[in-house]
Amino acid sequence: MKENIIVVGCGIFGLSTAFKFLQAKKKVTLIDPLPILDSLKSSSGESRNIRFSHANDQFYSRLSWEAAKEWKKIEKITNKKLFYDTGIVWFAAEDNGWESHSEKTIKMLNIPYQHLSPKDAMKLYPSLHIDDLHFVLHEPHGGTLAAKKCLLALFNLCLDLGCDYINGQAEFIKNDIYVNDKRIDFDTAVWAIGPWIKHVFPFIDMIKVTMQDVVFFESPDGWEAEKIPAFNDIKNGFYGCGSLDGMGVKLGYDVKGQEFDITQNERTHSESSVNHCRKYIGHRFPVFKKAKINLIKTCQYTMTPDANWIIAPHPEYPRHWIIGAGSAHGFKHGPALGQYVTDLILNNEDPDPKFALMERQERPGGWRDLYQYE
């Protein structure tokens, strides 16, 4: 029987999984030593993009499409604005690249999209430079999630459904879990602990944690998240979204950053990364050429060598499951990923082999190299 579930970690993976176990009428205890919105967590931050394009990978495309529907349901349950579904675009620099393969996949899955000429894409933004674009892939049902509000909404839903919560440090000792020297009873444990995975389970040495910078630029009217699509540029390595809560347009430089030890290092932004952001935003959106920076934030990515997640039982103690290495893509799959993990555990099923605890081929480009389309 799997009636008594422990979920360690209150980030997006942990809360989504706990929520789905609770919906399945299981007893759930959440454990986390940090506050829900602590900035050390990989799930911290104000916003995340949600999109369905994943090149040829139907699993990820289908999962994110289901997650978007789940987020809309959670909005209705909580009566809170969580999902700005104003679309998301891909600025394609070639005709037969990542974006084209994504288009074929989402078409196959009946996920709505538009293949726009660069000129037509100019209607989506108050200012847009298009001379270096071949086309623009527009996903009208993608957009921006208010990440902090999403975490709080899920956490409060879990409590409303009867979840127990322990604000404490969980210790893995062989097949058991202790908090404050007290053994906790459970049938199944899910460890969703982000960058701490490699510290609690040292045999999982493939995980790398890197520092990544996001820059918020002072924005004129018309650049709010509810008015413009979020955006991605794979060739140049950028992603961003409109202004949320007056913070300014967000731009992230999505090239693998410096490695980072969550237990030792301080988080400091890279001047090079910030300069790349400043140059790009003025290029792509000319109205921002002289824009002031409102804020710079440094977060961490937790990644495997091939950028696929870890979703697997412990090799020696199979009642412990380890999930994580979200590579900053947890929110776009969150509730649907939680359902996937819950179904695996309750139905005694094996996860997709790409999520296994195995050696993986290094892909230096991270998620942009993840989906092979040769």
Place the predicted regions along the sequence by residue.
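Predominantly flavin-linked oxidoreductase catalytic cores and closely associated redox partners
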Residues: 145-223
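Flavin (FAD/FMN) cofactor-binding and adjacent substrate-gating region
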Residues: 93-161, 166-167, 172-173, 303
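N-terminal Rossmann-like FAD-binding beta1-loop-alpha1 element of flavoenzymes
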Residues: 3-30
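Active-site substrate-recognition segment that forms the wall
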Residues: 19-23, 81-83, 193-317
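Dinucleotide-binding Rossmann-like beta1-alpha1 core, especially the glycine-rich loop
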Residues: 47-124, 237
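C-terminal catalytic lobe of FAD-dependent flavoproteins
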Residues: 283-374
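Glycine-rich FAD pyrophosphate-binding loop
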Residues: 23-43
